[in-house]
């Protein structure tokens, strides 16, 4: 009897908390190359929020005009969009104009973080370690420039579009003859192609929850992919990649990674939540920041829920915690929503 009563009280409490958020739009799908991943993330978030009594509704900006959010009287948005028009500051700017608070980073932080080259420039300016790179911009480079990249970065090296996620368009180039094809593949997706020094060693990722001084790093996950190839397919559609949490790094290294990630998160002025990817040189054990994802995946294979679970945070609680951070840029700067 008491067990049923406890369950009833827990459900009632969850429903009560959910009601405080008002009508919530879970933005999913969108128009980027990561649309399918976004739909998977969004469906998971939608189900989790509803299970906690939140009046949550799916909203696909590729199928509906964003202005309908205001007309339909949504109180806030959980952004489960990935890639362009979703985590690049575009939808964030639209929500700012509509006066609807949203999850994740604001306009400027989102637009900087999705641009891997801009992120690198900011990191280097702040003295944060990131792999050496060469930028190739469509229309301003020739075959000689492409051939010269291995001379500057060594082999192997990484070639990827500057503004895509989920490893879409990424190629690990192991010999000079593969450069032209790798650049052509990346250029199909972006006018800016990032060629990056390859760091051989442990690949790790670390989520962050919170804003400013209240931001905290979650447990680090070490990623062990088949043949070291953590590509789009291995990220989302296979079970052969290992995700180790606890990460099993040498003593003290996890804390160093967490501190570095928090520093990068605050440097870009991220808020709410994000996830940073890091490589650790196998010889020197020096960590190198690769990128920060300001709208991380929330699929069954995604890393933020996995790390949160290791910290004792369920998927449902994680969604609620992220939803609690909804804000507008001008609110966080001391203003109020119109």
UniProtKB/Swiss-Prot annotation:
Record keyword Nucleotide-binding present: yes
Gene3D superfamilies for the chain: 3.40.50.20, ATP-grasp fold, A domain, ATP-grasp fold, B domain
The protein's name in its UniProt record: D-alanine--D-alanine ligase
Taxon lineage: Bacteria, Pseudomonadati, Pseudomonadota, Betaproteobacteria, Burkholderiales
PANTHER family: D-ALANINE--D-ALANINE LIGASE, D-ALANINE--D-ALANINE LIGASE B
One Pfam family from the record: Dala_Dala_lig_C
Amino acids binding Mg(2+) 2: 291, 293
Cofactor note: Binds 2 magnesium or manganese ions per subunit.
Disulfide bonds: none
């Amino acid at each position: 009897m008491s067990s049923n009563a406890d369950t009833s009280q827990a459900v009632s409490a969850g429903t009560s908390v959910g009601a405080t958020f008002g009508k919530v739009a879970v933005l999913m799908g969108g128009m980027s190359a990561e649309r399918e991943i976004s739909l998977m993330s969004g469906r998971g978030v939608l189900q989790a929020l509803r299970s906690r009594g939140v009046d949550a509704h799916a909203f696909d900006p590729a199928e509906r005009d964003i202005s309908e959010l205001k007309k339909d009287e949504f109180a806030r948005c959980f952004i489960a969009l990935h890639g362009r028009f979703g985590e690049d500051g575009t939808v964030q700017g639209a929500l700012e104009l509509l006066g609807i608070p949203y999850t994740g980073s604001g306009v400027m932080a989102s637009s900087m973080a999705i641009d891997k080259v801009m992120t690198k420039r900011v990191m280097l300016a702040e003295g944060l370690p990131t792999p050496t790179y060469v930028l190739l911009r469509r229309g301003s480079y020739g075959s000689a420039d492409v051939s010269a990249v291995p001379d500057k970065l060594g082999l192997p090296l990484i070639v990827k579009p500057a503004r895509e996620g989920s490893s879409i368009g990424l190629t690990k180039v192991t010999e000079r003859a593969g450069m032209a094809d790798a650049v052509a593949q990346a250029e199909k997706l972006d006018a800016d192609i990032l060629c990056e020094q390859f760091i051989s060693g442990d690949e790790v990722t670390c989520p962050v929850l919170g804003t400013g001084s209240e931001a905290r790093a979650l447990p680090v996950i070490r990623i062990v992919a088949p043949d070291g190839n953590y590509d789009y397919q291995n990220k989302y559609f296979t079970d052969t990649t290992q995700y180790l949490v606890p990460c099993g790094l040498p003593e003290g290294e996890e804390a160093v990674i967490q501190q570095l990630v928090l520093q990068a998160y605050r440097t870009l002025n991220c808020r709410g939540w994000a996830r940073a990817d890091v490589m650790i040189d196998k010889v020197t054990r020096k960590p190198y920041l690769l990128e920060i994802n300001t709208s991380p995946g929330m699929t069954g294979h995604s890393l933020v829920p996995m790390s949160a679970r290791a910290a004792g945070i369920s998927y449902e609680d994680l969604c609620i915690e992220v939803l609690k951070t909804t804000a507008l840029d001008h609110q966080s700067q001391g203003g109020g929503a119109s």
